[in-house]
């Protein structure tokens, strides 16, 4: 760079602004140079164009026409991210409104520009040095709201200095201060000038402009006066070294990665500061997400629980089973009751058992109700008369005691295997084996306790008494027919063939017509499909509730983020003024949106697990919360935050610095 090259140079710069249907010429062909080490005051009445000139010099705005050069390089044509890099490294800003972030301490406010610098480190030491320069070491733990106006402006100056910028831009730095604080601020600026700092200041007060060594006066968008004061001498201190290449800086800014320089961590911290600063609003905005995630967790817990219950129930029923039950005959359209036509016999059981190529075994059953009494205790229960093969087919062989023998069934012996519920109600913790009980006033000897089965979809499977089928038919219930026949098929592949063969046999034995509905044959696959269908329907219902809740919650998040963008427009302007790129602003608001939805998601996960536990305890429903459901809930929370936060984040990123800073 030649020694005569100015630090800043404007060549025939024009700037117009639309006002309603007309336009205002804020700058009309302004040309000027500012050299290293100058202290320049720009003066003029309201509407003269002085602020517009400062905004262009500080890269907060672009001219419509003309050139703006820094160190001889034309910069007004640079892309937005390139200008952001220059604002961060070349310029420091002091505003009339201070523009400090209320939620941050003054140390964090001062080191804020370094989030966007691409440099690693927390820069606390540099922030302390800047605060020491402006005399605020005794206020380190304070927030802006705890400081006076003069102290807040000193914090703003410290923030402007932390990156050791080439130029300090001050827009009415004393405009909101009393005379004493104004004097203190101007002494600080004067001292910085003596150290070699280039300062460009806008003011409308002559006594403030008197601190500058050069005064430019604006009127109607034109420079009408440019005076250097005779009293001014060269700065006493060394000048700030001009080593920054704007074009190299633009390339560096464009290549910055939020993952490499630690900015992402800063965005996360600031996002949660914003969330916790508005706790009630944040909580209300995530209610939809909370309900949606809780629904997902509860839905999947119920679905998994139902699946486990179905598997356990089918396991308790035995494998590769088909059941043959009596249907309902109809006379003139009126149902005649279960099994009114097809009343099965032991011959049916024997004939089915002889199908050796398809069937491993068959057992007939008869069902009724029974009153069982032991001592002074009695219990109403289900009474099942069953065959010998039933124990192994339906997994009822006792773990305590024994099962019936074929001889006991043939002789119609009065022996019983009782379920766990019956044993508990009649005997408590005592062993019932060998004791005599009365079933419908007939004495029976307890020979075994059936394995625990748990609840099925309609009843407690442990609330049952099993007796030999012949005993039940001829001694207790007084029947000469079977209610149902259970058939164990040799393989799952042979179930369809076995069903067809059994159907043909029943039709033949009972002389029924083809397609007669007086009996039906079912296998466990049909039962499983029926139960699974019910579970799927419930899951779809809960899934719909979850989807609607997530949609409503997402819209709530988008609404609250749009409000947040509006409320924080000046903050966005400040961040852009100190070097934030479009990507930085967009990512910050996206992180905040995702932070909200993840917070709602975490609360929803806890609520969903709690609801599942309550359903298990009070409703007796089977539930099973899985890691998969928690991962899915977290994933959908994050996706909702990204999807519904994208528009507000984009809106924030597209704000122009100068317009955002002026927002009322």
Curated annotation (Swiss-Prot):
Annotated ABC transporter domain residues: 8-245
EC number: 7.6.2.-
Amino-acid positions noted as binding ATP in the UniProt annotation, renumbered to this chain: 44-51
Subunit text: Homodimer.
Main localization, broad class: membrane
Molecular function via GO: ATP binding; ATP hydrolysis activity; transmembrane transporter activity
Gene name linked to the record: macB
Segments traversing the membrane: 283-303, 543-563, 602-622, 627-647
Record protein name field: Macrolide export ATP-binding/permease protein MacB
A cellular-component GO term for this protein: plasma membrane
Keywords: Antibiotic resistance, ATP-binding, Cell inner membrane, Cell membrane, Membrane, Nucleotide-binding, Translocase, Transmembrane, Transmembrane helix, Transport
């Amino acid at each position: 760079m030649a020694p005569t090259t100015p630090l800043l140079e404007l060549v025939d710069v024009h700037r117009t602004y639309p006002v309603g249907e007309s336009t205002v010429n804020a700058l009309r062909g302004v040309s000027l140079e500012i050299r290293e080490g100058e202290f320049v005051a720009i003066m003029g009445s309201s509407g003269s164009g002085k602020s517009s000139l400062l905004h262009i010099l500080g890269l907060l705005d672009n001219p419509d026409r003309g050139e703006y050069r820094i160190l001889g390089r034309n910069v007004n044509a640079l892309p937005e991210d390139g200008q952001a890099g220059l604002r961060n490294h070349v310029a420091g800003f002091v505003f009339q409104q201070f523009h400090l972030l209320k939620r941050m301490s003054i140390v964090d406010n001062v080191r804020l520009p370094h989030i966007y610098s691409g440099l690693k480190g927390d820069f606390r030491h540099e922030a302390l040095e800047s605060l020491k320069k402006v005399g605020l070491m005794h206020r380190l733990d304070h927030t802006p709201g705890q400081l006076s106006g003069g102290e807040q402006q000193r914090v703003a100056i410290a923030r402007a200095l932390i990156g050791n910028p080439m130029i300090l831009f001050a827009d009415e730095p004393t405009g909101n201060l009393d005379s004493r604080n104004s004097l203190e601020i101007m002494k600080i600026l004067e001292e910085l000038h003596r150290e070699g700092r280039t300062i460009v200041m806008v003011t409308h007060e002559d006594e403030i402009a008197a601190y500058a060594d050069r005064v430019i006066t604006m009127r109607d968008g034109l420079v009408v006066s440019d005076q250097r004061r005779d009293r001014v001498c060269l700065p006493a201190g060394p000048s700030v070294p001009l080593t920054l290449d704007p074009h190299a800086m633009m390339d560096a800014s464009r290549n910055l990665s939020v993952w490499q320089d630690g900015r992402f961590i800063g965005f996360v911290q600031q996002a949660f500061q914003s969330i916790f600063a508005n706790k009630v609003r944040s909580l209300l905005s995530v209610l939809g997400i909370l309900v949606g995630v809780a629904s997902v967790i509860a839905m999947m817990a119920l679905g998994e629980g139902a699946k486990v219950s179905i598997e356990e129930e089918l396991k308790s029923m035995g494998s590769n089973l088909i059941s043959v039950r009596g249907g309902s005959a109809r006379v003139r359209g009126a149902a005649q009751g279960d099994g009114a036509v097809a009343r099965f016999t032991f011959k049916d059981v024997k004939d089915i058992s002889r199908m050796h190529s398809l069937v491993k075994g068959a057992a007939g059953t008869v069902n009724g109700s029974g009153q069982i009494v032991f001592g002074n205790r009695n219990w109403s229960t289900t009474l099942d008369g069953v065959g010998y093969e039933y124990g192994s087919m339906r997994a009822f062989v006792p773990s305590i005691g024994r099962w019936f023998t074929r001889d006991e069934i043939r002789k119609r012996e009065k022996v019983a295997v009782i379920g766990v519920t019956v044993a508990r109600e009649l005997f408590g913790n005592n062993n019932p084996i060998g004791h005599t009980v009365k079933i419908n006033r007939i004495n029976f000897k307890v020979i075994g306790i059936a394995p625990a089965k748990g609840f099925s979809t309609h009843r407690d499977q442990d609330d049952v008494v099993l007796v030999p089928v012949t005993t039940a038919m001829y001694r207790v219930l007084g029947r000469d027919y079977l209610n149902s026949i259970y058939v164990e098929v040799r393989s799952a592949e042979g179930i369809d063939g076995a069903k067809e063969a059994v159907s043909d046999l029943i039709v033949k034995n009972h002389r029924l017509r083809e397609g007669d509905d007086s009996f039906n044959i079912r296998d466990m696959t049909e039962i499983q499909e029926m139960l699974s269908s019910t579970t799927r329907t419930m899951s779809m219902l809960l899934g719909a509730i979850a989807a609607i809740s997530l949609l409503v919650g997402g819209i709530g998040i988008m609404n609250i983020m749009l409000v947040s963008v509006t409320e924080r427009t000046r903050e966005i302007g400040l961040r852009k003024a100190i070097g934030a790129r479009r990507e930085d602003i967009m990512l910050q608001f996206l992180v905040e949106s995702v932070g909200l939805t993840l917070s709602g998601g975490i609360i929803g996960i806890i609520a969903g697990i709690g609801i599942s536990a309550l359903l298990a305890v009070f409703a007796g429903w089977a539930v099973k919360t899985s890691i998969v459901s928690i991962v899915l809930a977290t994933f959908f929370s994050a996706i909702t935050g990204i999807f519904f936060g994208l528009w507000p984040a984009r809106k924030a990123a597209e704000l122009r610095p100068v317009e955002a800073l002026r927002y009322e």
